[in-house]
Every structure is written in structure tokens, then in C-alpha cells.
Amino acid sequence: MPLLHLLRQNPVIAAVKDNASLQLAIDSECQFISVLYGNICTISNIVKKIKNAGKYAFIHVDLLEGASNKEVVIQFLKLVTEADGIISTKASMLKAARAEGFFCIHRLFIVDSISFHNIDKQVAQSNPDCIEILPGCMPKVLGWVTEKIRQPLIAGGLVCDEEDARNAINAGVVALSTTNTGVWTLAKKLL
């Protein structure tokens, strides 16, 4: 089954920033885990724990310590991990990830109207499978983005409670990515 279809059926992505939150995510109902920590020496074991739990692993490559902003890090991740996807703010990294067969998530920060109006250009360069918009607690803006681009959206950052989660889903996002363990418990409730 295509990963995007599975994501729609499991709309809460547990974002983890340390080993403690990784274990909580593995024990949660969330089927997708975004790894926001680690380094080139530990990432293989982090992903292995996720895969051994039968879950999907996305690596935020920009946050991986010891890795450069060069495309060779994507080849490295393909060789040493079984990750399913790559998250990045950089189009060049996502192009390299696509070439290696990874599911690609372009993370974009919308802080003003200029960043909103530049979304099309950035997405055209990266051609991702999904776009993660931060902060994810802006339902009006999320709605504008869903009308502007064809790729499915993930709401990330500052999704603090069930109200934020439902507002984002109602605005048209396919999933939420959050470090908030309280929102993780909504994994099946949001369907």
C-alpha cells in the first residue's frame, strides 16, 4: 500500500527529539515516527528500533548531527538505515532523497506573506511527496496552502491539543507531526 495512503489512515506522526520520546512513540498508536535527533553514529540504531516495532521512520536530515548539507548524506542514510522517508528544508537534499527512493517531505516555515507566496517556487524545485507547514496551528493559512499547491500537507509545530489537531485536519491537511505526546493519543480519534 502506498505510504501516502497509509499516512491518511494514520494521521498523527510522532516527532521525537530524544531516546525517551522515541520509546514513548514506539509504545504509542502512532504508525509514523519523525526522527528529529541523532547523529551519523546513532541514526542506524534509532531507525532499527522504529522498524523493529513495525512502524515507519522519517529522518529530518537537517537535524542529523555530523551530517553535511551535501547530497552524499542521503546516500549514506540509504546504506546504513532502513528509513522510509526524508524530511528537509532544502530542495537539493529532497532531490537526492527522491533519487534514492525515499518518501520526501519538504518542511516549510510560514512566518509572513512573503514566505507564503514563495511556497510554489520552493515546491517546484523539490517536488516532494508531502509538504510540512510550520507552525501547524494556523488553520486559515493551512487552508490557503491546500488551495495553492497540489501536494498533500502535514501540519507541524505548535499543534498543542485536540482543537489544534481537528482545525488542521478540517483545513485539509492529511496528517499532523508533533512532539506533543498528548496529541499522539489522538492517532485513531481523528479519523
Curated annotation (Swiss-Prot):
GO biological process: glycerol metabolic process; regulation of DNA-templated transcription
PANTHER family recorded: GLYCEROL UPTAKE OPERON ANTITERMINATOR REGULATORY PROTEIN
Similarity comment: To B.subtilis GlpP.
Name this polypeptide is given: Uncharacterized protein YgcP
Species for this entry: Escherichia coli (strain K12)
Encoding gene, per UniProt annotation: ygcP
